[in-house]
Amino acid sequence: MRIKGIKSTIFLLCMFATASVTFGQRAFLVGPPQSSLGNSNALIESPYGILNNSIANLDANNGLVWVGPYLNFSSNQGASWYRPETDSLFGTVNRLFSIDVEDDVIVAGIGRNDVVGGQSIQTAAGFLISEDGGLSFQYRFPQLDGPEDDTQVYGVSTLPALPVIVPQQSPPFDIDYNPTNGDLWVAGWASGIRKSSDMGRTWSRVVLPPDNLDLISPEIPYSFSVEPQRGSNGSLNHMGFSVLVDKQGLIWAGTAGGLNLSIDGGVAWRRFKGDGTSQSLTGNWIISLEEQTNTSPSTIWAASWNTGESGGAAGQYGVTILENGGSSIRQSLLGEKVFDFAFNGTTVYVAGDNGLFISKDAGRTWDSISQFKDSRSSGRVTRPHSSVFSVEYDQGILWVGTSDGLLRSDDEGRTWTILHANIPLHPAQASNSVPNKNTYAYPNPFSRGEDSFVRIKYEASDALSGTINIFDFGMNVVREFRVDVQAGVNESMWDGMDMSGIPVSNGAYFYEVNLGKSRFRGKILVIE
């Protein structure tokens, strides 16, 4: 399996901002101190489960599931979680941008967000590579040039090239390892598409057609510039965003200027692009590529976005389906911003901004799920309008990464288990960041417009009915609702409304959970 997840955009999206650990705050990132030297030689159990509730990257293979942004993994269907001990990722500003798992080889592309001139710039931070199934990881530097790398030999031509010498705008948005020959491919936006034949120790540029050509071949002389940027000499088609080596060994490279195919290992290329017809790309920005292998030859599914460079049908969000090596192209889910794909035989799962889409007829018709309910508790749901960023199917289990947790289904999407970062009420070792509490609320502060509801966590000794009261700063009751709880830890939700259905004003609110003889109290800060 290769990368599973959203590829955050240079222009629009910053999924993995740095977050500190504070009890009851908006993000949960908890763990022991890091190792040194950038290498990992130990596995650390995560007592709090997954370490972030926004799951943008996901890979499941042979019963193991790996999730971002901190390389959590589980071998028992999410019952317990671990992470590698590495100071290149955990406890730093770095986050997982891409991951590919092929048997015992795990390649993780990491990046961060730098602030330059008041703007957040996504930045390459290198790679973590394991060849022993994740027991240890080695660090590799980002895929950059030296100042002297201002030309590129391509067949009979020596082309002018722009040296990419800084890591800003070159994060590893996608990565794919080819177990057949050991080649490693990365899509790094401003650094383009690159290949390594020595497990990331060195990298070479991959030359794609410029914006004014749809075919290139090494025996033909050219004079275009290899320049992954906008501008008179630059090419959108040199700005790499996704890459896939399919089971036949064909190389597919998605860029901001189209989808490129090589049948000779990445030398000669043919470019597909949107032309306004239904037999072309929906949009020229290819942010994700996945292979459906139950067809012969395989079918390639592309998340094709509007680049903003052209309008009309050629610039729509949607899914482009390429069959028979690209000789047959059709479109689906027009208007949907799609991030990822997974397959179970003929069933197709698509992760999108508006939910999870499921097709059993090769994308001609779709069912969709926009809100997920936990089968263990009727009151446990994902937030309305949560985005679905990533999806994977492995050994009968459907894994879905959302902006509000990791989801697992054992029955192909009919019922769900919701997994969140699980900060305990009574930790085995209490600390300032994870204190011993009878109750807490999250996210806190709470914004109804952004969060939809706040979750109140508490523990009941028995199954019974109770009430939760919300008070304003003057201790006036603004909301009361009944709860039916199970023995153990429970979560209830408040939508930020008063008893008249009117959103409450900004300020501090207090809550009281009444469960028979037990009462738990906490505070919620509402900021809209």
Regions found by a protein language model. Give the residues of each.
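Conserved beta-propeller blade signature
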Residues: 64-66, 106-107, 183-185, 194, ...
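Short, compositionally biased serine/threonine- and acidic-rich segments at solvent-exposed termini, linkers
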Residues: 396-434
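Asp-box/BNR beta-propeller loop motif
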Residues: 26-45, 72-89, 124-144, 194-206, ...
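Glycine-centered coil/turn sites that cap beta-strands in beta-rich domains
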Residues: 432-469
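Short coil-to-beta transitions that initiate beta-strands within beta-rich domains
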Residues: 33-61, 85-102, 111-113, 118-121, ...
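Glycine-centered tight-turn motifs at strand-turn-strand junctions
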Residues: 477-504, 516-520
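C-terminal tail/sorting-segment detector
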Residues: 508-528
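Short, glycine-anchored, charge-dense loop/turn motifs used at functional sites
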Residues: 468-478, 509
